[in-house]
Amino acid sequence: MREIIHISTGQCGNQIGAAFWETICGEHGLDFNGTYHGHDDIQKERLNVYFNEASSGKWVPRSINVDLEPGTIDAVRNSAIGNLFRPDNYIFGQSSAGNVWAKGHYTEGAELVDSVMDVIRREAEGCDSLQGFQITHSLGGGTGSGMGTLLISKIREEFPDRMMATFSVLPSPKTSDTVVEPYNATLSVHQLVEHSDETFCIDNEALYDICQRTLKLNQPSYGDLNNLVSSVMSGVTTSLRYPGQLNSDLRKLAVNLVPFPRLHFFMVGYAPLTAIGSQSFRSLTVPELTQQMFDAKNMMAAADPRNGRYLTVAAFFRGKVSVKEVEDEMHKVQSKNSDYFVEWIPNNVQTAVCSVAPQGLDMAATFIANSTSIQELFKRVGDQFSAMFKRKAFLHWYTSEGMDELEFSEAESNMNDLVSEYQQYQEATVEDDEEVDENGDFGAPQNQDEPITENFE
């Protein structure tokens, strides 16, 4: 079976990870001790992807929980879901990264990374055919960003041909915890561009907006935000956990969504999102879900897709839905909004249907878009980074851990390059194919794609 190993790093990563496991246990008919109580064979058919069956018949998540301080891990261990995980897979230090990326990446994290790699190796050896890893972390703190990216590069060295997916929570000015978030996030993106295969960008600001505007929660807690994230993670991984044709593993998902290797940062959306009091006043239909799914207010990243163009889109519908109706609706969206889709990637909207709906819903839809508007998010972090870096503010926290200023400049220019690459492909047209601007950069995919585009006109 094509197994996936899940790694939670840092406080945010562990809390999102715990919410994710709670959600998928419910969907697969497992209780929090790992005992199967399901009533439908489809729930059990691909359980092996995320769970390992122990000799007692208990299903154990292929999950590793890592942090540089014991607090969050203790909270997970003592929660309702704590007995589910293998006790040896909790790995924590006694210090803390203190929200400094350099501590997570070069000093404190580097001391712990070997024991994490040992556990990862052991988990990988317990797989028949490992397809890859998924990591949940935040980019604003110290452990999730610094140690998370260190782990990603170590895993890359050791498993170069396996897929690497990350669920990364980006910092946002409205919900800022620490002043150095822009540094941590930029240094992390610098690593993710090189080492990750697919990164699902989640943004605290967008999550707060959804909770307040759409779900009508006045004071959303982190628990509410994590439930939103776990719904999306459950939706994104639907095609990996249930039998189906499209995007049935991480590699196929990447092939369908990533046109150029560096541009692998996705926006995610989810439908239905309704306030608890309004649910009985709405009917869930495929057109309704499709409309809500493409709505900018449902995006979990604070970027507006209307300001850019979609390179590729994948949509997952769950529940008793007609495949034909889904195809028709998606086709309708594309033809009505053709300006928002780049024309040099034909058939760039993929849809998959899974008959198992999320718990408590008749149907739901998850949306993954590779949109050029994600550059807004990187621009925002980049501007904050530049404002601090040109004054060398708080830099001593990083240089005292052995970092060089040069690494900051490299990270800054890598992120600026990423923004301009997204911009370049947003403006590209089919005619640009062979035109080269003064810098010698190609404006769009080159000649080998030309016949394909022509065939579809």
From Swiss-Prot:
Top-level division of the source organism's lineage: Eukaryota
GO molecular function: GTP binding; GTPase activity; metal ion binding; structural constituent of cytoskeleton
InterPro entries per the UniProt record, alphabetical: Beta-tubulin_BS, Beta_tubulin, Tub_FtsZ_C, Tubulin, Tubulin/FtsZ-like_C, Tubulin/FtsZ_2-layer-sand-dom, Tubulin/FtsZ_GTPase_sf, Tubulin_C
GO annotation, biological process: cytoplasmic microtubule organization; cytoskeleton organization; microtubule cytoskeleton organization; microtubule-based process; mitotic cell cycle; mitotic spindle assembly; mitotic spindle elongation; positive regulation of intracellular protein transport
Residues reported in the UniProt entry to bind Mg(2+): 69
Keywords: Antibiotic resistance, Cytoplasm, Cytoskeleton, GTP-binding, Magnesium, Metal-binding, Microtubule, Nucleotide-binding, Phosphoprotein
A Pfam family of this chain: Tubulin
Ranges where the record places region Disordered: 423-457
SMART domains with a match to the protein in the record: Tubulin, Tubulin_C
GO cellular component: cytoplasm; microtubule; tubulin complex
Subcellular location: Cytoplasm, Cytoskeleton
Residues annotated as binding GTP: 11, 69, 138, 142-144, 204, 226
Main localisation: cytoplasm
Comp. bias (Acidic residues): 429-440
Co-factor requirement: Mg(2+)
Keyword Metal-binding attached: yes
Modified residues (Phosphoserine): 278, 280
Outcome when changing residue 421 to K: Increased microtubule polymerization and depolymerization rates. Increased microtubule stability. Decreased kinesin KIP3 subcellular location at microtubule plus ends
PANTHER family (alphabetical): TUBULIN
Further remark: Rhizoxin, an antibiotic that exhibits potent anti-mitotic activity against most eukaryotic cells except for yeasts, binds to beta tubulin.
Recorded family membership: Belongs to the tubulin family.
Functional summary from the UniProt entry: Tubulin is the major constituent of microtubules, a cylinder consisting of laterally associated linear protofilaments composed of alpha- and beta-tubulin heterodimers. Microtubules grow by the addition of GTP-tubulin dimers to the microtubule end, where a stabilizing cap forms. Below the cap, tubulin dimers are in GDP-bound state, owing to GTPase activity of alpha-tubulin.
Subunit architecture: Dimer of alpha and beta chains. A typical microtubule is a hollow water-filled tube with an outer diameter of 25 nm and an inner diameter of 15 nM. Alpha-beta heterodimers associate head-to-tail to form protofilaments running lengthwise along the microtubule wall with the beta-tubulin subunit facing the microtubule plus end conferring a structural polarity. Microtubules usually have 13 protofilaments but different protofilament numbers can be found in some organisms and specialized cells.
Protein name listed in UniProt: Tubulin beta chain
Source organism of the structure: Saccharomyces cerevisiae (strain ATCC 204508 / S288c) (Baker's yeast)
